[in-house]
């Protein structure tokens, strides 16, 4: 029997009604109340997520920048201390190793945040390509991560932080902030399409912080949220999930995150030739939004057709809690990717009519 990994918050899930599932080898809460309720809380008030299963890797040393420039697609040289950057790591053929965040904590000090399912693979990938005076250390077990997301997130977090959170702009962070007396890195980032913060602290401090935030946020409607709502929220905002929109067979350009690929940077990074070609001349496939016109919900790997020709497949799909529509993301032949193109999705051996629609499905009003 496989023993599932647990985050430092596992013991407090039950107190808040958490229902756990096996998520890539981790025992994590899929929901606390209901996915719909938690989803709506984040869109209208605020939600608190345990994201401690994510991986953290420290990269330090004189050659840390040169090393990162070689292994990621974005231009890390543009990052200033206190800044965060979204990027990807690719194989030589352009397929994706992982998507990740890089935090620049010092001139020779970077924190990489990687997907839970890829921690070992990513660490080995990074370690095998180290150059010069750069060190790569997996600190995942020492670090916990909480995400507070939603329009009321700032006001709630401000109650337990003395620094003015308005000073932390989007994709910026402050290190060594005290959150209710607990040292943490606080960044204005997230995976929901809403404003919010991600808080990195020592594993042993996570449970205390979780309970304190839920206590001070109760009045504003802060709810504990599970993986179910995290997925529907990121999906509506058209944020890719590794293993679905991104994989070793899908490039960042195909997946719609070409903005994180900088083929004109000087460094010769893995996948550069393929990604440069795709950015300049277009990729053969494109990730598009689809709305199902008839009954049925598109799910991962459901085939997409025009007539008898299979043109691609669904990567993610759901009944959108915000839009009240059955929608999906599909990776299809670029020839058919224009908005308003009529397609069919095979749902349980039956062809169902759908149409290509613009993405993101949801964008918050500023």
Swiss-Prot record:
Annotated source species: Bacillus cereus (strain AH187)
Family per similarity comment: Belongs to the GcvT family.
EC numbers for this chain: 2.1.2.10
Subunit structure: The glycine cleavage system is composed of four proteins: P, T, L and H.
Record's protein name: Aminomethyltransferase
Record flagged with keyword Cytoplasm: no
GO annotation, biological process: glycine decarboxylation via glycine cleavage system
InterPro entries named among the record's database cross-references: GCS_T, GCS_T_bac, GCST_C, GCV_T_N, GcvT/YgfZ/DmdA, GcvT/YgfZ_C, TrmE/GcvT_dom1
Reactions it catalyzes: N(6)-[(R)-S(8)-aminomethyldihydrolipoyl]-L-lysyl-[protein] + (6S)-5,6,7,8-tetrahydrofolate = N(6)-[(R)-dihydrolipoyl]-L-lysyl-[protein] + (6R)-5,10-methylene-5,6,7,8-tetrahydrofolate + NH4(+)
Domain of life (superkingdom): Bacteria
Disulfide bonds: none
GO cellular component terms, semicolon-separated: cytosol; glycine cleavage complex
Enzyme superclass (EC): transferase
This protein's encoding gene: gcvT
Record GO terms (molecular function): aminomethyltransferase activity; transaminase activity
Protein's job: The glycine cleavage system catalyzes the degradation of glycine.
Keywords of the record: Aminotransferase, Transferase
